[in-house]
Curated annotation (Swiss-Prot):
Catalytic activity: O-phospho-L-serine + 2-oxoglutarate = 3-phosphooxypyruvate + L-glutamate; 4-(phosphooxy)-L-threonine + 2-oxoglutarate = (R)-3-hydroxy-2-oxo-4-phosphooxybutanoate + L-glutamate
Cofactor: pyridoxal 5'-phosphate
UniProt name for this protein: Phosphoserine aminotransferase
Gene coding for it: serC
Binding residue positions for pyridoxal 5'-phosphate: A81, R82, W113, T164, D185, Q208, N250, T251
Length: 373
């Protein structure tokens, strides 16, 4: 049994993901007495000036980190990304028969999550699903954006730039005409790299990967979209209501917002999104180089479409997968089991995963191959 170097634990979970240690230490210090108020942040009213200032600071830091133009609204809500799978078509479809051909939306299918969003949209719209993930020589790849057969009259286009299960990424940014409403599910890539928000009309992200703990959903949307929100949308999902109430239509997850605010400060402290992106490129390149250096480990995505956040791989002898996960756990490398739909092994290396955590995984992979290869 491999038992070396177990003093430090690294969490490779796809979500809830690892949180920076120094942020957790700050939470520990403040848990019982936040800002000398003699009570926890969890006990503070969401309508108090103290908590409103927390949310205002979060929005300010998001605007600075992501260079969000003033014409975009920032909203926090409930329900995760799956909640948005329903909310988006409900808010933006035409108030007509869902199968009507003047109620068309484009959904780019690149994997499980984008397809799940498309299936939900079919309940409300005529959904044009474009399959852009292909396979050649047992390697998955994404068709270039300029080959996507987009409907010129579609109400919007939805896509997911990073599929966490298969580890497939669309690194291109949208280059469609200015009138096209582009919606992106950034749940697993938000804050991990620089993006040109002006190429999107609406992006959203669940919080439990790069933003903070689970429990909130971030929406960044152009203010022009608020002009045509359907009135029949339930209030808790209605974007106009959420914007006008400053994300306080009902009680938000105050603790998750507080902790997310600390993580944004941590990102600023270490150098912002530019530094985060640099680290993420280093981490993912190191891990993929390890996989490609041997026939023992296999990744089935072409290099141009490999995810920087989620690195799935298999072992040439698939019977070793369970052994790998168990021995890695004893080595201090947790949550490496692949998704149930794909199997194998998956290392999710979000923002909070330090380079030394990936180095420790690589060292374990070398030891494991030497033992079982």
């Amino acid at each position: 049994m491999i038992m070396n170097d177990t003093t430090k634990v690294y969490n490779f979970s796809a979500g809830p993901a690892m949180i920076p240690r120094e942020v957790l230490c700050q939470v520990k210090r403040e848990l019982y007495n936040w800002k000398n108020l003699k009570k926890s942040i969890m006990e503070i009213s969401h309508r108090s000036q103290e908590f409103i200032s927390v949310v205002q600071e979060i929005k300010h830091n998001l605007r600075k980190l992501l260079h969000i133009p003033n014409s975009y609204k920032i909203v926090f809500c409930h329900g995760g990304a799956r909640g948005q799978f329903s909310a988006i078509p409900m808010n933006f479809s035409k108030n007509a028969n869902h199968s009507s051909h003047n109620n068309v939306v484009d959904y780019i299918n690149s994997g499980y999550w984008s397809y799940s969003a498309a299936l939900e949209a079919k309940k409300y719209c005529y959904t044009n699903i474009l399959n852009v993930c292909k396979t050649n020589n047992k390697k998955q790849y994404i068709l270039p954006m300029n080959t996507w057969e987009i409907n010129d009259n579609s109400l919007y286009l939805h896509y997911c730039p990073n599929e966490t299960i298969d580890g497939i990424a669309i690194h291109e940014e949208p280059k469609f005409n200015d009138k096209k409403i582009v919606i992106g599910d950034f749940s697993s890539t938000i804050l991990s790299k620089r993006i040109n928000l002006e190429r999107y009309s609406f992006i959203y992200a669940s919080s439990q990967k790069n933003i903070g703990p689970s429990g909130i959903t971030l929406i960044i949307m152009h203010e022009s979209l608020l002009q045509n929100i359907n009135s029949y949308v339930p209030s808790i999902l209605n974007y106009k209501i959420l914007v006008n109430s400053n994300s306080m239509f009902n009680t938000p997850n105050t603790f998750s917002l507080y902790l997310s605010g600390l993580i944004l400060k941590w990102i600023k402290k270490i150098g912002g999104i530019k530094e985060i992106e640099k680290r993420n490129i280093i981490k993912s390149n190191m891990l993929y180089n390890m996989i490609d250096s041997t026939d023992f480990y296999i990744n089935d995505v072409v290099s141009n479409n490999r995810s920087r956040m989620n690195v799935p791989f298999t072992i040439i002898n698939t019977k070793l997968h369970e052994i790998f996960v168990k021995e890695a756990y004893k080595y201090g490398l947790h949550a490496l089991k692949g998704h149930n739909l794909k199997g194998g092994i998956r290392a999710s290396i979000y923002n909070a995963m330090p380079i030394k955590g990936v180095l420790k995984l690589i060292n374990f992979m070398k030891i494991f191959e030497k033992k079982y290869g």
